[in-house]
C-alpha cells in the first residue's frame, strides 16, 4: 500500500511539474504582454499607408505598437508579407499569392498607392530601424507541401 501511495504521489508531482508554467516560458512572453498590436501594420480606413506596406510597419513600430502579420511564399519561393490568400482585394492582380512569381507580385501596387508588397526580410529591416524592440507575431500561411522545406529553413534561421 505504501508503494502504491508513493507511486501516486510521484506521478502527481511529475504531472504538476509538467504542466506548471516555467519561469523561462513566462520571461519569453513578457514582451508581448500589456501592448497593443497593429494588425498588418498601422494604417487608416483610407488605406493610407496601405496595410502590409513598409510605411505601415514603420509607423506601427515608431508608435510603440507590436505587429501581427502574415507571410506566405510566392511561386518562386520568396517569403512575402501579405494577409490574403488572393491578390484581388489589395492589388490589381488576380489569383493566389502562391501562384504569382516575385517579379510579378512585387510590381503590384497596394490599394492603388505607390507602395508594393514587401519581402519578409525587408519588413524585418524596416521594423528594426524604426524600433528594434518591436514584438512581432508572425503567422506563416502555407497550404502546399512543396513549401515544407522552405518553412523548415525559416524556422531554423
PLM feature spans:
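Phosphate-group recognition and catalysis centered on beta-loop-alpha active-site segments
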Residues: 2-157
Amino acid at each position: 500500500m505504501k508503494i502504491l501511495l508513493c507511486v501516486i504521489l510521484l506521478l502527481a508531482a511529475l504531472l504538476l511539474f509538467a504542466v506548471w508554467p516555467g519561469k523561462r516560458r513566462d520571461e519569453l512572453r513578457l514582451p508581448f504582454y500589456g501592448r497593443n498590436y497593429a494588425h498588418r501594420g498601422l494604417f487608416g480606413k483610407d488605406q493610407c499607408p496601405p496595410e502590409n506596406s513598409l510605411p505601415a510597419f514603420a509607423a506601427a513600430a515608431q508608435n510603440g505598437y507590436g505587429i501581427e502579420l502574415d507571410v506566405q511564399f510566392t511561386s518562386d519561393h520568396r517569403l512575402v508579407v501579405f494577409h490574403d490568400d488572393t491578390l484581388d482585394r489589395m492589388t490589381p492582380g488576380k489569383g493566389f499569392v502562391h501562384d504569382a512569381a516575385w517579379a510579378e507580385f512585387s510590381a503590384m501596387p497596394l490599394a492603388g498607392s505607390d507602395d508594393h508588397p514587401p519581402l519578409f526580410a525587408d519588413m524585418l529591416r524596416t521594423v528594426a530601424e524604426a524600433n528594434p524592440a518591436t514584438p512581432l507575431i508572425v503567422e506563416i500561411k502555407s497550404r502546399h507541401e512543396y513549401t515544407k522545406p522552405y518553412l523548415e529553413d525559416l524556422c531554423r534561421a
